[in-house]
């Protein structure tokens, strides 16, 4: 399924192409050859469209690269404790149970540490304190 960013990029490139064609049409005598200029503009705009639009947002290669980057950054680092999705869900539910049973509510259960990381692969890592 096409995303909004891609459609917006296609629309903008199309509008630029239409405006350039109108410029060539009304000032055609000043240009060399209309067909040559139009084909050149089409090639340039197609190239810019391919470079400017992110066509591979959710492809498998990006997911693999993201997972390998994730492993390099967090899994081998001893300062981080990494859990799978099931482990983190179990730990989070245990934290909620502990909070409900604890009468002292002086702290918030929300962790706002910038160095915490949650990847699309459903593995969460938290920096050890």
Curated annotation (Swiss-Prot):
One of its GO terms (cellular component) is plasma membrane. Keywords: Cell membrane, Membrane, Plasmid, Transmembrane, Transmembrane helix. It is a multi-pass membrane protein. Its main location: membrane. It is found in: Cell membrane. The chain crosses the membrane at residues 4-24, 37-57. InterPro entries: DUF5425. Pfam families: DUF5425. To B.burgdorferi BBF20. This is Uncharacterized membrane protein BB_D15. The lineage of its organism: Bacteria, Pseudomonadati, Spirochaetota, Spirochaetia, Spirochaetales.
